[in-house]
């Protein structure tokens, strides 16, 4: 059975949109203006993005991710990749999508837009949100077309074991597409699921330049999969979807490998420092292991702390009262100045609630 049988039939049978006219001297086919008020190097911004520039960036990323150039397609950040995946495989009112909450809320958002079924396989905070194959098997149903792993997981910070991903790909080889969202993988001390692409045709990996690469403003990401899946995705990718300035700036940034290496190491070092400071703080009851640039903590003062930190200009992520993480905060690791300000603000909150004393449950 071909993995393409899991694609929506109406989309698989559709024709690719081919813009054409890329090499023409006079572009009289696309209704563009012949002038532009601004330019960007050699690029005339009055013209739609050049496919050649897109191919250059895809090749650059393919080399970095150690995959073949026909195994990657650019997206407008990871969100675009999630949206495309749900629309490509899920038929409204028929197919299902499995996720492992607490996780990135945009998965459920796009599944609802597609009017597909959402299968929830909850993680247990008592096990530090560790996922097992038994949990997946107990939740899976025959109409489950997509299984979504977030690794490292947002907001919990933990990795999904690569062996578990491989076993899931093998177990549901002809039944489900396995998607791994690796938005934070560069911060982890672990291999990427891209190393499994050659082995499993039902595996898709989503990557982004918004996190470790520091290019969130460019809105660039990619879908990585075996070539037949990438070719099929081209049927639903909007023409000219990636802006010329975004691609050009990304190409320039990716040439500076030393900057990325140093930045990631700095975040890891700062992460360890912040965790140590958190561990000394009596109002923080639990600190979860993290392979990301953020830290999830448990504190009974989560709501008060959110308001308190806002006075210092610090925004942190809290969670609704109905959430499993209602008494948790997700806090991003910043630069030295930001981290010190955070610790100082927490200390001032401690002074404000001085006299409180209770047992802590640290796992670090």
Curated annotation (Swiss-Prot):
* UniProt KW Glycosyltransferase keyword: no
Any one biological process term the GO annotation gives: L-histidine biosynthetic process
Residues annotated with N6-(pyridoxal phosphate)lysine modification? 211
Q: In its keyword annotation, does this UniProt entry include Transferase?
A: yes
Pathway named in the protein's UniProt entry: Amino-acid biosynthesis; L-histidine biosynthesis; L-histidine from 5-phospho-alpha-D-ribose 1-diphosphate: step 7/9
Listed A to Z, the keywords are: Amino-acid biosynthesis, Aminotransferase, Histidine biosynthesis, Pyridoxal phosphate, Transferase
Q: Per the entry, which co-factors are needed?
A: pyridoxal 5'-phosphate
Q: Which InterPro entries match?
A: Aminotrans_II_pyridoxalP_BS, Aminotransferase_I/II_large, HisP_aminotrans, PyrdxlP-dep_Trfase, PyrdxlP-dep_Trfase_major, PyrdxlP-dep_Trfase_small
Reactions catalysed, semicolon-separated, are: L-histidinol phosphate + 2-oxoglutarate = 3-(imidazol-4-yl)-2-oxopropyl phosphate + L-glutamate
Tell me the GO molecular function terms.
histidinol-phosphate transaminase activity; pyridoxal phosphate binding
EC number(s) stated in the UniProt entry for this protein: 2.6.1.9
User: What is any Pfam family matched here?
Assistant: Aminotran_1_2
Q: Which family does it belong to?
A: Belongs to the class-II pyridoxal-phosphate-dependent aminotransferase family. Histidinol-phosphate aminotransferase subfamily.
Oligomer status and interactors: Homodimer.
Q: What NCBIfam families does the record point to? A: hisC
Protein name, UniProt field: Histidinol-phosphate aminotransferase 1
- Its gene is hisC1
